[in-house]
Amino acid sequence: DSIQKTNYENYEIIVVDNISADNSHKICKEKFPEIKLIENKENLGYCEGNNVGIRNASGEFIVILNPDTKVEPNWLEELFNTYEKFGDGLYQPKIMAFEDNLFESGGNMLQMFGFGYSKGRGIQDKGQFDEPCEIGYASGACLFTKTNILKKIGLFDPFIFLYHDDLDLGWRARQLGIKSFYAPKSKIYHAGSYNYKWSARKFYWLERNRHYCLLTHYSKKTFYKMLPAIALI
């Protein structure tokens, strides 16, 4: 519901359903008939599911937004305002947990061994991350950019399926000279990150995709030089 309270008027909403097991797609269709609902015939994963939505979008700009988020009315306007300051790039808002005024991300950063981390995660918002700035990569929970920039980067990598998809996208963007930025006056709330419990399955996907990013984005020479350290982590 929060998206429809956005104070920016010129936008479309596209929902991509990866054969969800609950009735969420049916509820969406009944409650929000004006929304463009795309129902995939199989679970394509988070990455390719996003790509399906991107290919069906008609706007000059695009936002990738997780389904377990709530947005402030001015979220989109402030993303545009920060875009006007920095120009072409990938953008993320200030991302908060639903409870206790805790940060989920005040901007994502990338470590040389392929670990991504969020500035401020788990601490209270006291204005310490209120300045727009360049960051390592934009969070996939809410990622704003021009559609042609996203297509220039090559969309999301379907092999990744889920986890580290945003890290990979931001890494590829940086190799093309496309920077990522943090827009703190745009604010959203994200439930997922604090609800997901650690599991062997999640660890598998995170490590699989981290190593995939290292193999993909470093030269073979660099990767083999780093291999002893990678093996110890």
Regions found by a protein language model. Give the residues of each.
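Short, acidic, metal-binding catalytic loop of nucleotide-sugar glycosyltransferases
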Residues: 1-10
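A conserved acidic beta->alpha catalytic loop
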Residues: 2, 17-26, 42
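Glycine-rich, basic loop-to-helix element that forms the pyrophosphate-binding segment
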Residues: 39-57, 67
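Short aromatic/hydrophobic "clamp" motif used to bind/position activated sugar donors
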Residues: 62
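Conserved donor NDP-sugar-binding/catalytic core segment of glycosyltransferases
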Residues: 69-112
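A recurrent flexible, glycine/aromatic-enriched loop bordering the glycosyltransferase active site
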Residues: 102-105, 115-117, 123-148, 167-169, ...
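A short, conserved alpha-helix in the catalytic core of glycosyltransferases
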Residues: 136-187
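Active-site-adjacent helix/loop segment of glycosyltransferases
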Residues: 176-233
